[in-house]
Curated annotation (Swiss-Prot):
Keywords assigned: Cyanelle, Plastid
Name the record gives this protein: Uncharacterized 24.3 kDa protein in hemA-psbN intergenic region
Keyword Chaperone listed: no
GO CC term (a single one): cyanelle
UniProt GO BP: DNA recombination; DNA repair
SUPFAM superfamilies: ArfGap/RecO-like zinc finger
Native species: Cyanophora paradoxa
Main location: plastid
Protein origin, superkingdom: Eukaryota
Taxonomic path: Eukaryota, Glaucocystophyceae, Cyanophoraceae, Cyanophora
Length: 206
């Protein structure tokens, strides 16, 4: 299968002057932490796989104990966009610290891969809907769903005729776990905004 040996970078941490620890999400094994040596490009160049494949080693293993070659996805347009990078980092942290079980790793992998693909080609005004859709799917996997019908701060309902939520933009707060009326939280708590029609389309798609 095409995805069977793919890996997605979730996090990179410098180990020493010669190597980095890469936290990856793989199709077959879920989370995988490996050491990548900076001079591995010599080996990869010889294999004509430079910039396409990463050579994975067990921690502390010598050079002759290569585990596997993983095709690794690159998303240059995400790396060039600070807002897209925030989304990538947020979802990565969620996967690393909450979705660590190897069970159903293919399900999580497909959600994350699809999200990265969409972020790489989308315009700025589509970043939030893509993020919310992916977050919604991942949180459902954990058994919790964001609140998308009522303001989690005031309790106002989108379906109420008397609510001004129906006539204005609706904020979304990841830390509060759902939609929030504008101007009731500090500005930094809002990661984006919907109007009612956009939110209706999103909730019906999921």
């Amino acid at each position: 299968m095409l995805f069977a040996s793919n890996a997605i970078i979730l996090k990179i941490k410098q180990r020493n002057s010669n190597s980095y620890i890469y936290t990856l999400y793989t199709y077959e094994e879920g989370l995988k932490e490996v050491i990548i040596f900076t001079n591995q490009k010599i080996l990869c160049s010889n294999l004509k796989l430079y910039r396409i494949y990463f050579v994975l080693f067990k921690k502390g293993a010598p050079w002759d104990q290569i585990q596997r070659l993983y095709p690794l996805f690159f998303y240059p347009k995400i790396e060039q966009n600070p807002l897209k990078m925030i989304v990538l980092e947020y979802l990565s942290e969620l996967i690393i610290y909450q979705l660590y079980s190897p069970e159903n790793c293919t399900f999580i992998y497909f959600i994350f891969h699809y999200t990265l693909f969409q972020l790489n080609i989308c315009s700025n005004n589509m970043i939030l809907p893509i993020f919310i859709s992916s977050l919604y799917s991942l949180l459902k996997f954990l058994g919790w769903e964001p609140e998308l019908s009522n303001c989690v701060y005031t309790g106002e309902s989108l379906n109420s005729e008397n609510s001004n939520l129906t006539d204005s933009k609706i904020g979304f707060s990841a830390s509060y776990g759902g939609i929030v009326k504008l101007n009731v939280l500090p500005k930094q708590e809002y990661i984006g905004f919907f109007n009612k029609d956009e939110l209706f389309i999103f909730t019906n798609d999921n």
